[in-house]
């Protein structure tokens, strides 16, 4: 992938760390459960109270917006971006104070507005760029996503998250074609990578609210004729309406 900067590597590193933490915590869970079965331990009333705020499955919705700000690293294209999604989460591992959730996001709508740069012939001996704005729409899926919650037994839980997914746009992204460069465009199919954090507020045993920020990257992974990449600072809000 072009423009593979240190910031981009940090996001991949965060996803790797959360994945490793998940497997470690999951292994600890299996060990604890085996010991509990062997000794015939019973679940205490205190643990049952904790479980009221720690159910394994969750359903929710969320939405986010990234304003058009200066690009984060060389080569990325300036853009504004917004998306909404439906989320299924499952708590797959815990430690005493942390919990790991595996999440799947269905994204019915994403919108990006970006700057187009078309090479044109200004005069017989002068080339220039025709710059304007273009909007594209997409839908997609985020099948690989992890969220690491801290203070898992509290009603206010800070968290870290990392995710990888895909978006399919209604047109090639970007599209810089001109008479001088007729093939200067990306692809409709793009990959996404995100990493960040936030705070989850638990209101009762069935509902919670989430406020967060994530670095969000869109790229066709150099499968198109061009791949400038799009980077966004995405602020988002989520609502979990069912836990079971």
Regions found by a protein language model. Give the residues of each.
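Cleavable N-terminal export/targeting peptides
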Residues: 1-53, 244
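Short loop/turn motifs that connect adjacent beta-strands in outer-membrane beta-barrel proteins
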Residues: 47-56, 92-102, 151-157, 203-209, ...
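Transmembrane beta-barrel strands of outer-membrane/channel proteins
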Residues: 57-69, 102-110, 160-166, 199, ...
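Residues on the lipid-exposed face of transmembrane beta-strands in outer-membrane beta-barrel proteins
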Residues: 61, 65, 84-90, 142-150, ...
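Surface-exposed strand-loop-strand hairpins of Gram-negative outer-membrane beta-barrel proteins
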Residues: 65-84, 188
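Extracellular loop and loop/strand-boundary signature of outer-membrane beta-barrel proteins
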Residues: 71-75, 126-133, 178-185, 221-227
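Gram-negative (and chloroplast) outer-membrane scaffold detector with strong preference
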Residues: 82-174
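Outer-membrane beta-barrel "beta-signal"
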Residues: 229-244
């Amino acid at each position: 992938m072009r423009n593979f900067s240190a910031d981009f590597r940090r996001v991949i590193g965060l996803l790797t760390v959360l994945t490793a933490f998940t497997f470690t915590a999951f292994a600890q869970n299996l060990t604890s459960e085996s010991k509990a079965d062997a000794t015939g331990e019973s679940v205490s009333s205190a643990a049952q109270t904790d479980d009221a705020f720690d159910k394994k499955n969750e359903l929710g919705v969320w939405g986010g917006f990234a304003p058009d700000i200066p690009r984060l690293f060389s080569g990325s294209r300036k853009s504004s971006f917004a998306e909404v999604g439906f989320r299924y989460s499952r708590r797959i591992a815990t430690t005493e104070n942390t919990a790991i959730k595996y999440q799947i996001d269905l994204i019915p709508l994403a919108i990006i507005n970006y700057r187009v740069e078309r090479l044109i012939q200004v005069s017989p001996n002068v080339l220039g760029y025709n710059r304007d704005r273009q909007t594209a729409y997409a839908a997609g899926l985020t099948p690989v996503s992890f969220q690491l919650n801290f203070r898992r037994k509290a009603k206010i839980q800070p968290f870290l998250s990392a995710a990888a997914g895909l978006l399919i746009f209604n047109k090639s992204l970007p599209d810089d074609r001109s008479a001088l460069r007729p093939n200067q465009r990306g692809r409709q199919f793009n990959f996404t990578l995100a990493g960040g954090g936030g705070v989850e507020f638990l209101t009762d045993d069935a509902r919670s609210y989430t406020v967060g920020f994530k670095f969000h990257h869109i790229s066709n992974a150099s499968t198109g004729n061009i791949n400038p990449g799009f980077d966004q600072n995405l602020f988002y809000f989520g609502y979990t309406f069912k836990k079971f």
